[in-house]
UniProtKB/Swiss-Prot annotation:
Homodimer. Its EC number is 2.4.2.18. Binds 2 magnesium ions per monomer. The gene is trpD. InterPro entries: Anthranilate_Pribosyl_Tfrase (IPR005940), Glycosyl_Trfase_fam3 (IPR000312), Glycosyl_Trfase_fam3_N_dom (IPR017459), Glycosyl_Trfase_fam3_N_dom_sf (IPR036320), Nuc_phospho_transferase (IPR035902). This is Anthranilate phosphoribosyltransferase. Belongs to the anthranilate phosphoribosyltransferase family. Signal peptide: none annotated. GO terms for cellular component: cytosol. Pathway: Amino-acid biosynthesis; L-tryptophan biosynthesis; L-tryptophan from chorismate: step 2/5. 5-phospho-alpha-D-ribose 1-diphosphate binds at residues 79, 82-83, 87, 89-92, 107-115, 119. It comes from Streptococcus pneumoniae (strain ATCC 700669 / Spain 23F-1). Keywords: Amino-acid biosynthesis, Aromatic amino acid biosynthesis, Glycosyltransferase, Magnesium, Metal-binding, Transferase, Tryptophan biosynthesis.
């Protein structure tokens, strides 16, 4: 382990084999917490390569729980977090809209690391049981078309890494890894990151992980979602090819809103915001959700443009389909 950390300290990249060996040692409890923290910091300072990120994701996913389900076209819209925006739970709210629009949503998430409320926190506040067994979660998904997979429970091996992450208190490669290690074999994905310079490389990792179609999104002001406060950049993975583009609210016929307009609060406050959006109450929260759900519909390939996706998202919310999915999840995942 010492040799690996020294190599990273010299800003030398690890091979896929080296990274695989290191992570296998970590997730089997053979590395100290201090060494793990040193590794995470060294990788962050050097900058993580697609090969390193793919290796860690493949190892972590190999140690994940298996969710038995009859659904084979699941999608996730988990972001990396760590953007310090303190926004409401955008992707979690959008997940219900996507599910209401007919997409099988297996939302994968965790408690907050660097914000006030993570997806697990807000859903727990809404009465969702985070601790169902894998077989029970599979049944929920088959019955409702939506399920929440609590990352802490899905990845027992993460217990070896979490203390170092919490002690560091800053985004690391594990933030970048979380959305890549979904327990299910996803076909499509919308993945938010707060570092636009990683758009293309993250799309490459998704390709390496077997995604058929995906969008990696980086919003304005470091937001790890699409934003209405400036230019949003995306990388689209389609037919094995990666293309980069960007858009503004004006491009989609939407109004601008400042970051302050979408600030959230604690889990209970964010739960109230989520409910207000699904009830179609006009606000910057609603508009931001519509934008991100629209991008999700486009990432899934359900529609042919982001603008069409936004229109579909509005329709789903207005017809009560998104709220219906929340009520179903509250009924079955309890």
């Amino acid at each position: 382990m010492k040799e690996i950390i020294e190599k990273l300290a010299k800003f030398e990249n690890l091979s896929g084999v080296e990274m695989t060996d290191v992570i296998e040692r970590i997730v089997t409890g053979r590395v100290t917490e201090a060494q793990i923290a040193s590794l995470l910091l060294a990788l962050k300072m050097k900058g993580e390569t697609p090969e390193e990120r793919t290796a860690i994701a493949q190892v972590m996913r190999g140690h994940a729980q298996h969710i038995p389900t009859e659904i084979h076209d699941a999608m996730d819209n988990c972001g990396t977090g760590g953007d310090k925006s303190f926004s409401f739970n955008i992707s979690t709210t959008a997940a219900f809209v996507l599910a209401g629009g007919g997409i099988h949503m297996a939302k994968h998430g965790n408690r907050s690391i660097s914000s006030k409320s993570g997806s697990a926190d807000v859903l727990e506040a809404l009465g969702i049981n985070l601790d169902l067994k894998p077989a029970e979660l599979g049944k929920v998904f088959d019955k409702t078309g939506i399920v929440f997979l609590f990352a802490k429970n899905m990845h027992p091996a993460m217990k070896y890494i979490m203390p170092a992450r919490l002690e560091l208190g800053i985004p690391t490669i594990m933030n970048l890894t979380g959305p890549l290690i979904h327990p299910m074999a996803l076909e499509t994905q919308l993945l938010g990151i707060s570092r636009p310079e990683l758009l293309e490389s993250t799309a490459q990792v998704l390709k390496n992980m077997g995604r058929k179609r995906a969008i990696v999104v980086a919003g304005p002001e470091g937001l790890d979602e699409a934003g209405l406060n400036g230019t949003t950049k995306i990388a689209l993975l389609e037919n094995g090819e990666i293309s980069l583009s960007s858009f503004t609210p004006e491009d989609l016929g939407m109004e601008d809103y400042a970051m302050e307009d979408i600030r959230g609060g604690n889990a209970q406050e964010n739960a109230e915001i989520l409910l207000s959006v699904l009830k179609n109450e006009a606000s910057p929260f609603l508009e931001t959700t519509v934008l991100n759900a629209g991008l999700g519909f486009y990432a899934n390939g359900k529609i042919d443009s982001i603008k069409e996706g936004v229109a579909l998202a509005r329709q789903v919310i207005a017809r009560g389909k998104a709220l219906e999915k929340l009520r179903l999840l509250q009924e079955y995942q309890k």
